[in-house]
Amino acid sequence: MEGQDEVSAREQHFHSQVRESTICFLLFAILYVVSYFIITRYKRKSDEQEDEDAIVNRISLFLSTFTLAVSAGAVLLLPFSIISNEILLSFPQNYYIQWLNGSLIHGLWNLASLFSNLCLFVLMPFAFFFLESEGFAGLKKGIRARILETLVMLLLLALLILGIVWVASALIDNDAASMESLYDLWEFYLPYLYSCISLMGCLLLLLCTPVGLSRMFTVMGQLLVKPTILEDLDEQIYIITLEEEALQRRLNGLSSSVEYNIMELEQELENVKTLKTKLERRKKASAWERNLVYPAVMVLLLIETSISVLLVACNILCLLVDETAMPKGTRGPGIGNASLSTFGFVGAALEIILIFYLMVSSVVGFYSLRFFGNFTPKKDDTTMTKIIGNCVSILVLSSALPVMSRTLGITRFDLLGDFGRFNWLGNFYIVLSYNLLFAIVTTLCLVRKFTSAVREELFKALGLHKLHLPNTSRDSETAKPSVNGHQKAL
């Protein structure tokens, strides 16, 4: 009888492992297909290339797609875990959700951590070096020579990074155990290195997210149709049509020898056509789209941003009075045993919305920073090297998103797998400083955003607008006379 029970337990464990592997494969396959379509939408359409370059580009494309799929999985990790916990609480004995259990969720967290390390330290460096390699001098040109050069570059890069990490760990901890841990690569150095990368990702999120939260209002304003208050769209369309016709006549009258003027006029004509298209779209929009959707979206963004800042402020107070508020504090009751949100399913849904909102804001803020402005992908005109850089950046941001969400108190869901083992998560001063900086910087960015109009008027009243300050430089560019002599006041 005991032998039959043992066999039955082994069979059940085997079926459970097969089921979890199948679910993980299907989820990743869906993310991979979506990521492939996203990258091919932005990737520059390559010209006729040699077979060797085509193979290299194809391999780099597959590796970049894999990395972007892992990034999407890391973003969905925390929301999927939160909603799974609430579903297991609401339907504990339901036959159709038996596949959803703690073992599956723990497995997803472990796979996300493993693949993030693999992409960050192996696949993306390999894709970059493979794309830039030409083979060592003296060797026969071909795929093998490029692979050999890539592997040598990866080996040198690994030695350099491990040396830097070993020196940093030895400086931080002078204990003999830290010196001897050089021989324990898997147990110490890779987790320590990923902990450093996670901290850098959280610092990058700390820089990008507040900027993105304030920038989201501008981005949504560009995507939506604004209300036409005290505006005559017909007159504006008539003026822009005259300007378009004037530019077209000037282009037809210029000779082909004046190449510089032709290119300048073509660019000006393209800008005028774009502006005309936007005005026509605003004119064709329905009344409810103009007068209801835009204000509702702006109010929704303001509410989400305010709730995020309030949650961070509450988390700061909890950190000061309760040590269990630390991200690396005591372990929770486990998945499916208790709700981690005060308001149950509604609170969990709000947490998921805020997590996605913070991720979108961080991406918007990342591409809004001047230092990363050249990284912005363009449709059908993004080189493979730039795609690799974008995939690495998105991977760093998405891998740090669960850590940032837990550190800021957006959710109380415990970090699973290697995400909850970072040493700096147990440092009270680092966590408290992170929360304070996020709240202060976000508040300052929002105040700067909503007081920009008043500030510009004060600058003009005091005569400071002539100093070419950052806020007034954009206005001066938009008010610059166009090529045909008309002032662009639209």
Swiss-Prot record:
Chief location bin: membrane
Stretches assigned to the Extracellular side: 1-19, 84-110, 173-187, 313-339, 405-426
Superkingdom classification of source: Eukaryota
Location of this chain's protein in the cell: Membrane
Tissue: Widely expressed with strongest expression in heart and pancreas.
UniProt-listed InterPro entries: LIMR, LMBR1-like_membr_prot
Keywords: Coiled coil, Membrane, Receptor, Transmembrane, Transmembrane helix
A Pfam family that the UniProt record links to this protein: LMBR1
Molecular functions (GO terms): transmembrane signaling receptor activity
Membrane topology: Multi-pass membrane protein
Residue intervals annotated with topology Cytoplasmic: 41-62, 132-151, 209-291, 361-383, 448-490
Record GO cellular component, one term: plasma membrane
Chain coiled-coil ranges: 250-287
Function: Putative membrane receptor.
Family: Belongs to the LIMR family.
Disease listed for this protein: Preaxial polydactyly 2: Polydactyly consists of duplication of the distal phalanx. The thumb in PPD2 is usually opposable and possesses a normal metacarpal. Triphalangeal thumb with polysyndactyly: Autosomal dominant syndrome. It is characterized by a wide spectrum of pre- and post-axial abnormalities due to altered SHH expression pattern during limb development.
Protein's name according to its UniProt entry: Limb region 1 protein homolog
Organism: Homo sapiens (Human)
Gene label: LMBR1
